Regions:
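Interaction-mediating elements
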Residues: 3, 28-353
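Residues on the lipid-exposed face of transmembrane beta-strands in outer-membrane beta-barrel proteins
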Residues: 406-412, 449-455, 496-500, 551-559, ...
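Strand-connecting loop/turn motifs
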Residues: 136, 218, 385, 417-419, ...
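C-terminal outer-membrane beta-barrel translocator/porin domains of Gram-negative envelope proteins
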Residues: 301, 395-400, 511-712, 717-742, ...
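Membrane-embedded beta-strand positions of outer-membrane beta-barrel proteins
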Residues: 390-392, 422-426, 476-478, 571-575, ...
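C-terminal motif of bacterial Sec signal peptides marking the signal peptidase cleavage site
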Residues: 23-26
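Gram-negative/organellar outer-membrane beta-barrel architecture
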Residues: 178-181, 320-321, 340-572, 587, ...
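N-terminal secretory signal peptides that target proteins for export/translocation
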Residues: 1-10
Length: 811
């Protein structure tokens, strides 16, 4: 997007003000310190040892955390301690007027960190203890101070030494039944011969053993019954989750000469201490009670509750929230089955997944009449049955100046008391473009709607026996959409889909649509058709009306949870096929008409035959408290087959824009090394292809908190690369086809910086992109473009620096 002149002047003033503040912040912040004080300006951790570089990086990050490095230097913004300078303006310079009262909010201030050598020594002690807990019993930590002009920096030198690995694993379990459970699950053990010793691994193993024992019915089993003993010591070193190893290092001195020092571990599971030498008792489920309309602070003994005894469950309620048959099937507990912690979690999650209840609480109480029996009580607090919402959107991209949209959404979460959800939505939007002459013009308009039904089970048009414990949801949807690109084309589409959605695990999700049907109708503006489409056979075939019907399968993996706060992954793969069953219907119609007609001739619409595969992998690293590194790799390919020569326009790949390669405008990059320099490119610059490769790296960091922390100003720097290609040669677009030996030459590369305003519930993003490598640039054999940069030339900046404004992160 090119900003209008007045906007650029305003932005220039803002950036100039920011530069002045940063320059002031770079000035000395030490003049208010006492003579014997110094400002703590930096800390560094050097890790040396015979370990992998990735392990060194993880150790360096852990040792730099606030919990171990007790004194942290003041944060810097663009090499300036602006927050310390602002602090001094408020408390030492006593600045106070309306401007400073806004700027000098507490969120934007940092008290100068005065260096304290005692805290450095405490950090050394904590780091050493942490390294011992990671199995580095011979580790040493030293530090060096560097003082200059009342500023101190500290370097911590860490030598890891050799890491202990586990050797022999033995078990001391007097209860033979529990010992059998442990051995049956031993292949899943986290402590095995050759594994590096870490106290966290033993803690995780304790949790794993506790879980499998509780899943076998041992309701009262306590994790504190599990102890670990190392080597020949008869001392339980790991009675607690965190264990300092001070005082025990001398035990392992005999291992110093070994290439890989080892230790034996004995796992001991004690019998319950409160009942002498008796063994742990297995419990089973006795009775199950459900309260489907239980209010907050309700009374389960309320005499006005109606009671309905179903096959497995006694339902107590004032009114029917869910049909009793469906209610009983949704509860996964069964009388007579052993107590299971996993079944507890599955039951709660299944009931939450229905979407009917706001709170789900499952409690167990011992049955007074039967030994080792538990009664289960499910307290369910309902949500509101119907929801109505309105969403407003404002957007911007390099393709249009201003976009706005509104959507109206309605949802009934419990249709006919069956757990079926009815959803309806209407949406409309426009895109406006500000021309060089100044006036705003309408570039596109869109409106559409969708109706969907979601069943909390595996729904089929015929009856089959199903496992009640399945978490499959069935979804049927019907939608329509109309998109008009002014003076170019109108696209009308109607789509129908039927399929299933389920979670294989907490990290893995499947979306399967065995039936999808999409009709796409295209009406071309006559002038656009004559001047652009008719001159491009590929574009002409792309804009033909089409029937897209087939199957769609998606697999999603995401481990973004509390266990993976430092780094986590996201992976999605999607496979779509169109034409297989439509061609079958086409053949049947043709045979029934004596080969006179078929589905295509009757509807005057071509069947689209293609297979499309996409894969999207992302990984995120948290770098300290205020930084993060986000990476993404995307690959996609679509292959037309049978009578189809090209993919439908709405299924083709594009590159460039705020969520792609940001140094190019939306949909203008590629394919390959092709550059459209014809007059039609000014009318319709969109470029599409059959395949796409893309990679992105983005470093994100915090800048300032504003208005009491309600708005956070964040920054980013990024590197994007990729392109689109054709599968086959296109004589009208030379260089557009994919050739492996030309891959490096064809890859486009761009870099840039960005700022983001984070309002918590949404984020506004402004990115500046500039090309590093241009596939169609002929001045360098590999397309490197840096030598052509002319940042002083306003016309060059206008044509090469791309401004992208968008809502949300690019990935």
């Amino acid at each position: 997007m090119q900003l209008p002149p007045e906007s650029r002047i305003f932005l220039l003033k803002y950036l100039l003000l920011l530069a002045v503040l940063l320059a002031l912040g770079a000035c000395s912040n030490t003049k208010y310190l006492q003579k014997d004080q110094s400002l703590y300006v930096s800390s560094k951790v050097d890790v040396n040892g015979d370990i992998l570089n990735s392990e060194k990086q993880d150790l360096r990050s852990s040792l730099s955390s606030k919990s171990l490095m007790t004194q942290q230097p003041n944060k810097k913004l663009l090499n300036s301690r602006i927050k310390v300078w602002l602090y001094n303006q408020k408390y030492n310079e006593k600045k106070s007027n309306w401007f400073w009262n806004i700027v000098l909010s507490k969120r934007n201030l940092e008290e100068p960190v005065v260096y304290d050598s005692l805290k450095t020594k405490e950090s050394v002690s904590r780091m050493t203890s942490y390294l011992h807990n990671q199995g580095f019993f011979y580790a040493s930590v030293a530090y060096a101070e560097k003082m200059k002009r009342h500023k101190t920096s500290v370097t911590y030198a860490v030598t890891t030494g050799k890491n202990f690995v586990l050797d022999k694993i033995t078990y001391d379990v007097p209860d033979t039944a529990i010992l059998a459970i442990v051995h049956a699950n031993e292949r899943l053990s986290l402590i095995k011969k050759g594994v590096a010793f870490k106290s966290a691994t033993l803690s995780s193993e304790r949790e794993r053993l506790t879980r499998i024992i509780k899943d076998a019915g041992y309701y009262k089993f306590n994790r504190d019954a599990i102890e670990f003993t190392v080597d020949t010591l008869n001392k339980a070193l790991f009675r607690n989750t965190l264990n300092p190893f001070e005082g025990f290092v001398n035990i392992f001195n005999e291992n110093k000469g070994r290439e890989k020092p080892t230790m034996d571990v004995e796992v001991r599971i004690k019998n319950p201490e409160d009942v002498g030498d008796s063994t742990w008792q297995q419990y089973h489920i006795s009775k199950i009670y459900a309260y489907p309309d239980f209010p907050i602070n309700g009374n389960p003994s309320d005499s006005s509750l109606k009671e309905d005894l179903r096959k497995y469950v006694t339902i107590r309620s004032h009114q029917d929230i869910l049909k009793p048959k469906i209610m009983s099937k949704s509860i996964l507990l069964r009388p007579g089955e052993p107590y299971s912690l996993q079944q507890y979690n599955n039951t709660v999650n299944k009931l939450y997944d229905l979407g009917i209840w706001q709170f789900v609480t499952l409690q167990y109480k011992e049955n007074k009449d039967t030994a080792n029996a538990l009664d289960a009580y499910l307290f369910l607090t309902p949500r509101r049955k119907q929801e109505l919402g309105v969403n407003f959107e404002v957007s911007n991209s390099s393709d249009y100046t201003l976009g706005s949209g509104v959507s109206l959404n309605y949802r009934h979460i419990n249709l006919n008391k069956s757990g079926t959800q009815l959803g309806m939505s209407l949406n409309t939007g426009i895109e406006l473009l500000r021309t060089q002459q100044g006036p705003w013009v309408l570039q596109s308009r869109e409106f559409g709607g969708e109706v969907s039904l979601t069943w909390p089970r595996f729904a089929l048009p015929f009856n089959i026996k199903q496992a009640n414990r399945s978490n499959v949801k069935t979804r049927l949807s019907l939608g329509a959409n109309f998109l008009s690109r002014i003076e170019k084309f109108d696209i009308s589409s109607i789509n129908l889909s039927y399929g299933y959605d389920w979670n294989e695990t907490s990290y893995k999700r499947w979306i399967v649509r065995p039936f999808t049907l999409n009709y796409v109708g295209v009406t071309l503006n006559q002038l656009f058709k004559d001047s652009t489409v008719d001159k491009n056979p590929y574009l002409k075939r792309s804009f033909e009306p089409a029937l897209i019907g087939g199957e769609n399968i998606s697999f999603i993996y995401s481990n973004n949870d509390l266990l993976h706060q430092r780094h986590y992954s996201y992976f999605r793969v999607n496979l779509e096929e169109s034409g297989l069953w439509l061609n079958g219907i086409n053949s049947l119609v043709s045979a029934a008409s004596g080969r006179k007609n078929n589905l295509e001739t009757l509807t005057n619409v071509n069947i689209s035959n293609f297979v499309k595969l996409e894969a999207d992998y992302r990984h995120f690293w948290k770098l300290g408290v205020h930084g993060a590194l986000a990476t993404r790799v995307y690959a996609g390919v679509g292959i037309p087959y049978s009578t189809s020569q090209v993919l439908p326009y709405i299924r083709q790949f594009t590159a460039g824009g705020p969520n792609s390669i940001r140094a190019w405008r939306l949909r203008t990059l590629g394919p390959g090394s092709f550059k459209d320099s014809s007059s039609t490119a000014q009318i319709f610059p969109d470029q599409t292809g059959d395949m796409k490769l893309e990679g992105n790296v983005e470093y994100r960091f915090d800048l300032l908190r504003m208005f009491g922390g309600t708005i956070n100003l964040k920054g980013a720097t990024f590197l994007d690369m990729g392109n689109i290609w054709m599968i086959k040669k296109d004589p009208d677009r030379p260089g557009s086809d994919f050739q492996f030996n030309q891959l490096y030459r064809d890859l486009a590369m761009g870099t840039g910086v960005g700022v983001r305003l984070d309002f918590s519930f949404f984020l506004i993003r402004l990115d500046w992109g500039i090309p590093l490598k241009v596939p169609y640039f002929t001045g360098n054999k590999n397309g490197w473009y840096v030598g052509e940069w002319d940042l002083k030339d306003g016309e060059w900046r206008k044509n090469n620096i791309i401004w992208n404004i968008a809502i949300g992160y690019p990935f």
